[in-house]
Amino acid sequence: MKVNLILFSLFLLVSIMACNVFAFSISGGGSERSYKETEKTSAMTTTHSTKLQPSQAILFKMREDAPPLNLTEEMPPPFPTKANYLIHPVR
């Protein structure tokens, strides 16, 4: 009984580790190339470089042209606030 429990827990541990390794290899995580790309893009955003990719330039343009947010203005909620039905307690 004790040996079965040890073998089962060992099998469970190995299968969980195998699933993690498999998922990690599918996602392509941990590659040196992806690390260098993220390092480059983070450096671009922190130094406000003008060398933007076309997709980044479009996003930046949209952000720049967006109207300023007015957080002090009262806006009605998009849903009714008062219930028009009665909630009966469960008996």
From Swiss-Prot:
Could you tell me where this protein is found in the cell?
A: Cell membrane
Q: What is its main location?
A: membrane
Lipid-bearing positions (N-palmitoyl cysteine): C19
Query: Where does the secretion signal sit in this chain?
Result: 1-18
Q: Where is the lipid attached (S-diacylglycerol cysteine)?
A: C19
Q: Which UniProt keywords apply?
A: Cell membrane, Lipoprotein, Membrane, Palmitate, Signal
What are the disulfide bonds? Answer: none
User: Topology in the membrane?
Assistant: Lipid-anchor
Q: Name one GO biological process term.
A: colanic acid biosynthetic process
Q: Name one GO cellular component term.
A: plasma membrane
The name of this protein is Uncharacterized lipoprotein YpdI
Provenance organism: Escherichia coli (strain K12)
